[in-house]
C-alpha cells in the first residue's frame, strides 16, 4: 500500500511540472500576442474628455492599456477599443480614474511648459559678462545634467527656422560665444571715447547702456578719494575703470610711502637746483700728499713706507690736475641762468653785477656804434633760423652794434657759441623790473610781477613795456625778432613806422628808434600805466602808440613835438602788410608773377630799411626756395649754410 502511494506521488509531481510548463507557455503566448498587437497600433496618445488639453506620454508598454481613440462627435462613452482587455474590470477602473487622469495630465502639462520655458530662457541667457576679467562666462544654476544640451542650441549653425534663437555663432578673444546684442553694441563703437565709456559732448557711448551709471559713480569715488586724486581725471588709470588692469588687485599707482619718497626727492631738488653750479671739491686729493709728507718725519719705517707709495702719490697728483681741468671745462660748457644774483652774461664782465651795473658795463666796455634792444619770451628751442637771420641782417649792416636781448626764458649765455664766438657784441639779460622801471610811471608793475605774469597776454604786454622802458632809459633802436634789416639804421632819430592795414593806418612798435629820456616815450609809459588792460591784446601796444602819437602831435608844443616824434610811412619798415605776407612764401608758378616779384624785390631793397615777415601769422609756413621771403631772409645772412 505504501508502494502504491509512493508511485502515485511520483506521477503527480510529473503532472504538476507538465502543467506548469503549459501555463508558462500560455503566458508567454499571451504576452507575445499583446506585444504584437501593441507594435501594430498607432502612436499612443490620450485626449481628455474635455478635448482641451493634449498631454504627450513617452512610448512604453506600461501604458498601452490606456490607448483610447475618441470619435469626432461622441462623448465620453463613445469610445471604441482596438484591442482585448486583460482584465474585465479595466472599464470600471478606467471610468473611475478619468477625473484623476485629467488632473494628473493638467499638472504634467504645466510642469512640462515650465520646463520648456526654463530651457528656452537658459538657452538665451545662459551666459553673463564678467566685468572684472573682461570675458563671457556660463551662468551657474541647479539644473539637471540632462538639460545642459539646451545651452548650445542657440549657438548651433544649423539651427531651425523657428526664430527663437537670440544669438548666432560668434567667438571672442577667449573663444567664448558672444551674445548678438553685445556684438551689435561693439559694431556701434567708432572712437576711443566710446571704447573707454567717456561722454564726448552730446554723444554717449553705446557700451554705457546698463552700467554707465555705475561707471560714473565709480569714477567719482576714485576722484574724491585722496589716495587716488590726480589732476588728469578722465584718462588717469587710477580714476578710469576701463584703463585699469583687471588681473591686478586694487588700483595701481604710488603708495603713500612712494609719495613720501617722491616729496623728499623734490625737496632735495629744490635745495640744489640745476641752475646752481656747485664747484667740485678736491679736499680728499690734497690731504693724502700731506700725510705722505708726515710719514717722512717719523722714522725709518715710515720713510720706507713713503718710498713704496711714491708712485701712488704721482698718480694722485695727476688725478688732481685732471679734476681741476675738468672743473674749468665744466665752467665753460655749463649754461648760465638768471638766479637773482646774475642778470646778464658777456665775456669779460663780472656775472654777479646788478642789472643796471651790467648794462652800464656792457655799453661802456664795448665801443658801440649803436645800441639795439630785442625781446624774446619763447623757449630757446623756438629761436629758429629765420629769427637768426634777423640778427644776422642787423650785424651785417652794423658790425659794431651792441645788441641786448631781454629774455626770461633762455640761458644768459645763449649766443656764446654762435655770435659771441664770432666776436659779435650780443648779450642776453633778464630785466630787473625794479631797476628798469625806476623813475617811470610804470614802476608799480615791478611789485605785481608775480600776479601779472599769470595773465593771458603777459608775454606780449611784458615785451611792450620792456621795449618802451629800455629805450627811455638807455636810448637806441628796438627791433622785433622777425624783422630783417635791409639798410643802415644809423640815421634814425625818434622814429616810428606806420602800419598799413585794411581797417586803417596805425603805428607799429616793431621798429623804433628814440633818444634817451624821450618825452614821447615818457608819455607812452604814463599812458601804459593809466589805461592798462590785461584782457586786450593790442590796447597796450600798437593802439597805445597811435593814441599817444595823435595827442602828442596835436598838443600845445606842436613844432617841438614834431622834432621828438618822426613818423615814417609803411613802405620804409613794413613794405608788405600782414594780410598779404603769406602770398610771398611760395615760389610763383607763372612767369608774370615771377617777374612781378623780382620787381618788388628790387623796389623794397631801394626804398625800405627793414622787412617784417610777421611771424605771428607765418610761424607755421616754410618759405620755398627762390620765393620773395626766402630772398630777403638770405639777402644778408652770415651763416648762410643753415637751412631755413
Swiss-Prot record:
Acidic residues: bias regions: 89-114
Residue ranges of the region described as Disordered:
65-117
What is the top-level taxon of the source organism?
A: Eukaryota
> Which Gene3D superfamilies does the protein's record reference?
3.90.550.20
State the name under which the record lists this protein: Uncharacterized protein At4g19900
A Pfam family of the record is Gb3_synth
Enumerate the InterPro entries for this protein.
Answer: A1-4-GlycosylTfrase_dom (IPR007652), GlycoTrfase_DXD_sugar-bd_CS (IPR007577), Nucleotide-diphossugar_trans (IPR029044), Put_A1-4-GlycosylTfrase_plant (IPR044789)
Q: Which residues form a coiled coil?
A: none
Amino acid at each position: 500500500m505504501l508502494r502504491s502511494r509512493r508511485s502515485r506521488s511520483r506521477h503527480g509531481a510529473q503532472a504538476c511540472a507538465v502543467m506548469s510548463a503549459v501555463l508558462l507557455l500560455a503566458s508567454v503566448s499571451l504576452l507575445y500576442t499583446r506585444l504584437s498587437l501593441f507594435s501594430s497600433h498607432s502612436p499612443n496618445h490620450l485626449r481628455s474628455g474635455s478635448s482641451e488639453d493634449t498631454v504627450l506620454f513617452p512610448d512604453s508598454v506600461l501604458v498601452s492599456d490606456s490607448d483610447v481613440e475618441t470619435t469626432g462627435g461622441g462623448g465620453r462613452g463613445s469610445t471604441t477599443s482596438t484591442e482585448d482587455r486583460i482584465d474585465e474590470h479595466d472599464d470600471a477602473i478606467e471610468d473611475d480614474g478619468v477625473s484623476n487622469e485629467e488632473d494628473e495630465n493638467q499638472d504634467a502639462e504645466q510642469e512640462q511648459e515650465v520646463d520648456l520655458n526654463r530651457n528656452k530662457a537658459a538657452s538665451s541667457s545662459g551666459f553673463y559678462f564678467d566685468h572684472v576679467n573682461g570675458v563671457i562666462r556660463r551662468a551657474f544654476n541647479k539644473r539637471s545634467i540632462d538639460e545642459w544640451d539646451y545651452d548650445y542650441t542657440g549657438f548651433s549653425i544649423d539651427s531651425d527656422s523657428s526664430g527663437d534663437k537670440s544669438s548666432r555663432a560668434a567667438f571672442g578673444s577667449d573663444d567664448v560665444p558672444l551674445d548678438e546684442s553685445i556684438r551689435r553694441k561693439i559694431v556701434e563703437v567708432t572712437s576711443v571715447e566710446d571704447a573707454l565709456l567717456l561722454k564726448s559732448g552730446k554723444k554717449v557711448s553705446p557700451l554705457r547702456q546698463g552700467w554707465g551709471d555705475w561707471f560714473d559713480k565709480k569714477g567719482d569715488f576714485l576722484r574724491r578719494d585722496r589716495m587716488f586724486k590726480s589732476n588728469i581725471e578722465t584718462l588717469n588709470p587710477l580714476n578710469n575703470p576701463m584703463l585699469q588692469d583687471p588681473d591686478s588687485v586694487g588700483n595701481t599707482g604710488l603708495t603713500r610711502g612712494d609719495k613720501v619718497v617722491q616729496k623728499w626727492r623734490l625737496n632735495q631738488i629744490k635745495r640744489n637746483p640745476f641752475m646752481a653750479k656747485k664747484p667740485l671739491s678736491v679736499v680728499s686729493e690734497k690731504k693724502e700728499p700731506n700725510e705722505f709728507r708726515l710719514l717722512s718725519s717719523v722714522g725709518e719705517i715710515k720713510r720706507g713706507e713713503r718710498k713704496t707709495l711714491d708712485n701712488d702719490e704721482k698718480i694722485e697728483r695727476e688725478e688732481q690736475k685732471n679734476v681741476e681741468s675738468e672743473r674749468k671745462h665744466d665752467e665753460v660748457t655749463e649754461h648760465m641762468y638768471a638766479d637773482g644774483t646774475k642778470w646778464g652774461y658777456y665775456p669779460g664782465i663780472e656775472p654777479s653785477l646788478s642789472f643796471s651795473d651790467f648794462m652800464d658795463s656792457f655799453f661802456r666796455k664795448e665801443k658801440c656804434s649803436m645800441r639795439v634792444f630785442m625781446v624774446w619770451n619763447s623757449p630757446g628751442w623756438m629761436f629758429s633760423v629765420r629769427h637768426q637771420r634777423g640778427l644776422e641782417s642787423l650785424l651785417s649792416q652794423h658790425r659794431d652794434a651792441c645788441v641786448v636781448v631781454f629774455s626770461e626764458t633762455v640761458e644768459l649765455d645763449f649766443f656764446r657759441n654762435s655770435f659771441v664766438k664770432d666776436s659779435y657784441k650780443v648779450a642776453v639779460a633778464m630785466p630787473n623790473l625794479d631797476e628798469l622801471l625806476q623813475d617811470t610811471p610804470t614802476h608799480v608793475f615791478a611789485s605785481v610781477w608775480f600776479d601779472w605774469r599769470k595773465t593771458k597776454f603777459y608775454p606780449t604786454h611784458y615785451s611792450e613795456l620792456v621795449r618802451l622802458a629800455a629805450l627811455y632809459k638807455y636810448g637806441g633802436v628796438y627791433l622785433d625778432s622777425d624783422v630783417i634789416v635791409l639798410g643802415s639804421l644809423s640815421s634814425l632819430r625818434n622814429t616810428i613806422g606806420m602800419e598799413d592795414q585794411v581797417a586803417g593806418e596805425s603805428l607799429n612798435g616793431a621798429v623804433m628808434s628814440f633818444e634817451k629820456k624821450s618825452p614821447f616815450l615818457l608819455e607812452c609809459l604814463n599812458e601804459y600805466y593809466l589805461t592798462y588792460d590785461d584782457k586786450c591784446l593790442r590796447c597796450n601796444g600798437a593802439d597805445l602808440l597811435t593814441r599817444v602819437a595823435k595827442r602828442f602831435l596835436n598838443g600845445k608844443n606842436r613844432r617841438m613835438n614834431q622834432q621828438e616824434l618822426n613818423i615814417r610811412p609803411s613802405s620804409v619798415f613794413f613794405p608788405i602788410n600782414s594780410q598779404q605776407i603769406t602770398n610771398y612764401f611760395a615760389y610763383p608758378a607763372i612767369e608774370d608773377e615771377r617777374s612781378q616779384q623780382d620787381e618788388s624785390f628790387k623796389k623794397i631793397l631801394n626804398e625800405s630799411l627793414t622787412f617784417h615777415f610777421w611771424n605771428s601769422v607765418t610761424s607755421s609756413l616754410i618759405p620755398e626756395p627762390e620765393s620773395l621771403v626766402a630772398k630777403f631772409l638770405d639777402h644778408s645772412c652770415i651763416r648762410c649754410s643753415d637751412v631755413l
